[in-house]
């Protein structure tokens, strides 16, 4: 019995270090290869020993797929390929291929050059890892080998994010990565067709959340920022380099222009330029409004937002600073936070999810005394606000995607256990499908029913349409035709088309039975008597008298002939195909009983 096996190596009942091992019809695929931002030791990387205890990873894995450039989805990639050892193909979209190495190098600098961490990948390892990448286009079916194929779908979330369908024969799995079912100011909504996979693996970060109106959230955000700078305070907004950062920059830029505000807004050095470059390069990945206006006005060339210098953090007076990274776990955002945390006039606005173990998660949980590096204590007096501008699907969006894809089963990853359990029950109740939520290292095995996909010729469908026999939606219907197999693909076509394609002449197998009838009339008159008798007897059948004197009932042919030895006897030749054997037998019996007497 074919089966699908799924083992989360990371993001199983957890958010961070996304890494899921999928085995489908003998093919092994690793989905994402992320790091956990809450750890600074070996726990930051997935446990790759689950993949295989012996032998090379390249021999076991058929391919690796990366859904997008966030480090909790790609951060362990150089460690995995260059330090653990993997030489096979790594698939990702073109924007992810361009942006991923930049973020990996930025994080490496923080971890190694500034913190002095050991057992970490080098700059050269990042370059060598990226040489193994195969970039894919949206909706492009990529043949990994003779049996395994993958296809990317638009996921929203960040520039270049994609959901992937993995298919082997008739078995398929869809992995969402992170996605957003709601369009925002610079990206469109996630979309997938009704692909009906055996299994849908979906993120569940906001498994129990249904977001309020986006307009209300934006108004609340602008109000809090404005009130803080009005009283002379500073606002820190920790963000990741690309994605939510651009969303909030567009929002503040528009507000500053409308209100004619002079308070400076800063963005981490270099990131504005990088964002401009990549959004221009991959403009087709943005939403329709950005694409339409890009030629006349680049939405990412900001008038009020300037590059940030670290010395600006000590400047007196109000300011707004977008700084990376988004969870306050390292880098410039953490440095600024430490400087501003002691002033109650200031505010930090956390616009996205923070994983456990990060400073962002600690302050959102209510901690106001933090132990920093070197066992130094930091008292947080500044205001802390959480305002979800997350580019993840909420509970409503997850349910919408499940309904759109129509999977046979669902598996939840990238979420917190209690919230996932609530969503799991909701999915099972509403869609009547099995839903799983394995922990890291736990394997879920799903038996699949083998099926053979069959293409149906347009001619056969048109014939059904002409006859008015098209089925109602979701109601099964039998189609009769000839099944042709070519290059391991099956097609159902009409018998005429099959003969033509195969270069065969049409042959027909008919059965003929002789019925002796006492009748002195000529053969034509006997045939006419047969026609009249059958016409009056068989009200529900098509009975015809042909010009050559023969009679037909559906596909059954009846001909009258003289008896070779007895002039007073006629021979009725009744012939039929095997499809009409029952009707042929009935007519033979009927005629053997004789014809009614003709009026004299």
Swiss-Prot record:
* Highest taxon listed in the record's lineage: Eukaryota
Main location per the UniProt record? nucleus
GO terms for cellular component: cytoplasm; cytosol; INTAC complex; integrator complex; nucleoplasm; nucleus
Which residue numbers mark the cross-link Glycyl lysine isopeptide (Lys-Gly) (interchain with G-Cter in SUMO) in this sequence? 381, 462, 475
Q: Which residues cross the membrane?
A: none
What positions does the entry give for Zn(2+) 2 binding? 72-73, 178, 414
Residues involved in Zn(2+) 1 binding: 68, 70, 157, 178
GO MF terms listed in the record are: RNA endonuclease activity
The cofactors required by this protein are: Zn(2+)
Record localization: Nucleus; Cytoplasm
Q: Which GO terms describe its biological process?
A: RNA polymerase II transcription initiation surveillance; snRNA 3'-end processing; snRNA processing
By its UniProt entry, which Pfam families does this protein fall under? Answer: Beta-Casp, IntS11_C, Lactamase_B_6, RMMBL
Enzyme active site: 203
Q: How is its activity regulated?
A: The RNA endonuclease activity is inhibited by BRAT1 that forms hyrogen bond and hydrophobic interactions with the active site.
PTM summary from the entry reads: Sumoylated; sumoylation regulates its subcellular location and is required for integrator complex integrity.
- Where, by residue number, is the motif HXHXDH motif? 68-73
Enzyme Commission identifier(s):
3.1.27.-
Supply the alphabetized keyword list: Cytoplasm, Hydrolase, Isopeptide bond, Metal-binding, Nucleus, Ubl conjugation, Zinc
Q: Position of motif Nuclear localization signal?
A: 469-479
Q: What does this protein do?
A: RNA endonuclease component of the integrator complex, a multiprotein complex that terminates RNA polymerase II (Pol II) transcription in the promoter-proximal region of genes.
User: Which PANTHER family does this entry report, sorted A to Z?
Assistant: CLEAVAGE AND POLYADENYLATION SPECIFICITY FACTOR FAMILY MEMBER, INTEGRATOR COMPLEX SUBUNIT 11
Subunit notes for this chain?
Component of the Integrator complex, composed of core subunits INTS1, INTS2, INTS3, INTS4, INTS5, INTS6, INTS7, INTS8, INTS9/RC74, INTS10, INTS11/CPSF3L, INTS12, INTS13, INTS14 and INTS15. The core complex associates with protein phosphatase 2A subunits PPP2CA and PPP2R1A, to form the Integrator-PP2A (INTAC) complex. INTS11 is part of the RNA endonuclease subcomplex, composed of INTS4, INTS9, INTS11 and inositol hexakisphosphate (InsP6). Interacts with WDR73; interaction is required for the assembly of the RNA endonuclease subcomplex in the cytoplasm.
Its family remark reads: Belongs to the metallo-beta-lactamase superfamily. RNA-metabolizing metallo-beta-lactamase-like family. INTS11 subfamily.
* The protein, known as: Integrator complex subunit 11
Identify the coding gene.
Answer: Ints11
